[in-house]
């Protein structure tokens, strides 16, 4: 499977486009950064590797951001396609899982109670919804933005509603 256009549009809305590199630890409202850090980000949430810094340090075009997002999504789609053993995901379930994985990362997703529960194993939470919404912390602190994002993703997964909660 691949993410749908509705899923892609939803992801782009949450990730927000930045044509200049910024620190994801500070957020989009920060000034563009002039040197690489582990949180260096560009486009729609693309984490810039140290080896990529010279390529992205002066910024990118909107088309390059689109291309980068599509390239990044290949790994997240492959993760969901490989790791989720549920017999058949609906498109909205798949979209929500790709969006979650994009935000928390492949390693976190593979270790998550969300994946365990989807695959019929016991997780650390009584319900899949609670396991999903547990990814609500930024640097160890509960984040209202992440609470809203997880609720929005859950609505996609459980209700097929692609609407951002603010």
Annotate each predicted stretch with a short phrase:
Residues 1-9, 13-34, 46-48, 53, ...:
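Long, amphipathic alpha-helical surface segments
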